[in-house]
Amino acid sequence: MAKDIKFSEEARRSMLRGVDTLANAVKVTLGPKGRNVVLEKKFGSPLITNDGVTIAKEIELEDAFENMGAKLVAEVASKTNDVAGDGTTTATVLAQAMIREGLKNVTAGANPMGLRKGIEKAVVAAVEELKTISKPIEGKSSIAQVAAISAADEEVGQLIAEAMERVGNDGVITLEESKGFTTELDVVEGMQFDRGYASPYMITDSDKMEAVLDNPYILITDKKISNIQEILPVLEQVVQQGKPLLIIAEDVEGEALATLVVNKLRGTFNVVAVKAPGFGDRRKAMLEDIAILTGGEVITEELGRDLKSATVESLGRAGKVVVTKENTTVVEGVGSTEQIEARIGQIRAQLEETTSEFDREKLQERLAKLVGGVAVIKVGAATETELKERKLRIEDALNSTRAAVEEGIVAGGGTSLMNVYTKVASIVAEGDEATGINIVLRALEEPVRQIAINAGLEGSVVVERLKGEKVGVGFNAATGEWVNMLETGIVDPAKVTRSALQNAASVAAMFLTTEAVVADKPEPNAPAMPDMGGMGMGGMGGMM
């Protein structure tokens, strides 16, 4: 396919049009008075959102060169979302400002490589200063403030703070769509996995259709049990102890299952069998997790153990086990704290090394189950459109809160970027490098300016006043007052602000050093079918 090539100024100008188109659509959502953007969906109702990355991903431009510019800025939003989970609109606004200012200087004859050096120096200084001024997040109320600012909803802030308090900072918090109008929190304590009882005859509570075992022994194996003789020795030992038994195996079937059910119904002993969770290597890892949590052993031929050799000592123990049709929850496992801590350390090390998003999610789940539980926020709304929008906001708030716990908080509303202004301005540089630093200085003002504009105010007036205020004091666009942002609870996670700045600078530097752009030439439209004129049936009469 033939290619279309543009060089230097012409190339950068074409791409800038794409940058502006995307950024202008995204930046209207910034701040407490930001507006929403409606996205058309081919099926179902349109999506109404104020989430920068969701809007950026939807934008596709007809002109290939403009589209490349738009995709570059979409990359800034996407990367910031991957690293920090929020701050995508701020990143887009910063990238647009740096690209715009940089292009003015390149057009005026500045050397792009010199500008790039200056931009990189300025960002390093800004990030260092952000680390200095960030404050660690402490207590439930601080967590609630971060979440409430991100979601623009105090109720959501309280829910997320409560969820994090209940399951800990490493706990898994998931979002589900609720059937009702209200948003609720549901916390599952202990280790839960998605496997239910092998037979409904094993239930102990017919009203709730669940089996509850108090202080049970837990037999953990990766084998299939089809012959009762295999587990008879250990079964007899458990019956002598007068305790219930939970069997976690690859499968329990045939004669073995029938014998267990008959004895359960006769009241000889209380036993529940469930299938082992997961598949393949993940199943082995999860069984090992359960064994460590309950102080038992995984009975597997890989370790030279068979079921006949199992004793009460090789079984796990727990305070309580609840088994429903679909889930099994093990509460208060009696495993040793040292072994559990070692296992947690092992999973954390794997988390740092993995590059797969799926593996990371599964490792995070395993970690949460060992640490203390899973919280589910059930999102409710009156309509499907509102539900989708609300779910996106809560997702952002959740990511924002996790980022705050990791690296602390800074003054919100773009104030922290203005607080590092003096440090960046003090960098000694000359020529194009100094111009690069000035480009970043101009960009640091942009989020505050845009928040003010979205609130219907004159952005430049707010920016100039902010330069004269002391660190931490900023403009609350929601009320129109000048306040101490940290004390008022208007805060941003330092990680979100840092990621937005670094990703914006990275793409802006690449953009300014672009000298040629290559795109596919649009294919000419196929000619329309020629008009058949008088070739109707009547005109063909002579051919009959």
Swiss-Prot record:
Q: Which GO terms describe its cellular component?
A: cytoplasm
Q: What is its EC number?
A: 5.6.1.7
Where does this polypeptide localize? Answer: Cytoplasm
Name of one Pfam family that matches? Cpn60_TCP1
Catalytic reactions on record: ATP + H2O + a folded polypeptide = ADP + phosphate + an unfolded polypeptide
Spell out the molecular function terms from Gene Ontology. ATP binding; ATP-dependent protein folding chaperone; isomerase activity; unfolded protein binding
Q: Which GO terms describe its biological process?
A: protein refolding
Oligomeric state and interaction partners are given as: Forms a cylinder of 14 subunits composed of two heptameric rings stacked back-to-back. Interacts with the co-chaperonin GroES.
Per the record, the similarity remark reads: Belongs to the chaperonin (HSP60) family.
Report the function annotation for this chain: Together with its co-chaperonin GroES, plays an essential role in assisting protein folding. The GroEL-GroES system forms a nano-cage that allows encapsulation of the non-native substrate proteins and provides a physical environment optimized to promote and accelerate protein folding.
Designated name of the protein: Chaperonin GroEL
